[in-house]
């Protein structure tokens, strides 16, 4: 064999090796599609204000219903007793089956505040970003469960809950968390609650300036798993630099004994100046932050499935 022929064969072999390994290498380096989550959020937020009793709220319901029409979708309609009287509300639950016996719930609220109805409050970060996040997570779960397949771990249910926000400007235990209080009670009655291995809440985490607090009431072992997921992706600078107790949609489940965690960035804008104002708009959220969220959520799901 000539010197030229020898090195030609070596080069050919290396080329084949690279072509063979590249798909696996690329797969191992893939990140969550935060751009898709941002686009879903943009479409959803374009509906406008979506407070209870409004036409925008009805449009938000129709948006979710249409998007998930080919999935295992349940609509959980109920009437909430509120300071303005009985109000029709609706949770949306999308189910993706798993091999293991049990359920992981990922949740977000989707409505905006009734008491902000007189301003153009669209809740891009607060309700909009996390609706987009769960929709993009659904894309991945849908691909994994296509053609009758099941997820390797537990079933995953996505909950888009209604009525998280208070009707009145002052938040109280009785005027807030309507959807999750209703759902936790319903699932306690019918035995569903016993199947839930973890409840993971996403709230206000599309913020470009992402700084997720450690919600201090959250279940310790879930916090530890999220830390593990964060460490894997080297996202430490975005997570858990301070502790804070937050009244949020995880509490109705936590109080009934379900391991629960609230993934929240409660400080939004300089001195929290964007929170619950008409400054909560799409220009304040980013695909980068949603990529971080999605990576951590999906890895946390995987880690829970390994317990």
List where the protein language model places each region:
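Acidic/histidine-rich catalytic neighborhood of metal-dependent amide-processing enzymes
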Residues: 121-228, 233, 237, 242-245, ...
């Amino acid at each position: 064999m000539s010197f030229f022929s020898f090195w030609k064969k070596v080069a050919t072999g290396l080329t084949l090796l690279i072509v063979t390994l590249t798909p696996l290498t690329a797969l191992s380096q893939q990140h969550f599609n935060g751009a898709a989550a941002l686009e879903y959020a943009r479409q959803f937020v374009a509906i406008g204000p979506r407070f209870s009793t409004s036409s925008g709220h009805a449009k938000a319901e129709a948006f979710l219903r249409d998007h998930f029409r080919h999935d295992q979708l349940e609509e959980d309609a109920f009437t909430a007793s509120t300071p303005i009287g009985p109000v029709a509300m609706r949770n949306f639950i999308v189910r993706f089956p798993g091999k293991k016996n049990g359920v992981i719930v990922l949740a977000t609220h989707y409505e905006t505040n009734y008491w902000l109805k007189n301003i153009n409050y669209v809740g891009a970060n607060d309700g909009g970003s996390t609706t987009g996040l769960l929709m993009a997570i659904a894309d991945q779960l849908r691909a994994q469960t296509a053609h009758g397949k099941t997820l390797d771990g537990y079933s995953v249910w996505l909950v888009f809950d209604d009525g998280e926000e208070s009707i009145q400007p002052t938040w109280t235990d009785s005027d807030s968390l309507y959807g999750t209080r209703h759902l936790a009670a319903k699932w306690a009655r019918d035995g569903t609650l016993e199947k839930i291995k973890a409840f993971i809440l996403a709230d206000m985490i599309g913020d470009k300036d992402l700084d997720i607090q450690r919600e201090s009431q959250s279940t310790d072992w879930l916090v530890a798993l999220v830390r593990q997921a964060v460490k894997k992706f080297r996202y430490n600078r975005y997570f858990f630099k301070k502790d804070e107790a937050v009244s949020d949609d995880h509490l109705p489940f936590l109080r009934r004994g379900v391991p629960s965690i609230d993934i929240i960035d409660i400080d939004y804008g300089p001195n929290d100046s964007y929170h619950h104002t008409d400054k909560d708009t799409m220009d304040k959220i980013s695909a980068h932050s949603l990529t971080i969220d999605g990576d951590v959520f999906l890895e946390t799901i995987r880690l829970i499935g390994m317990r």
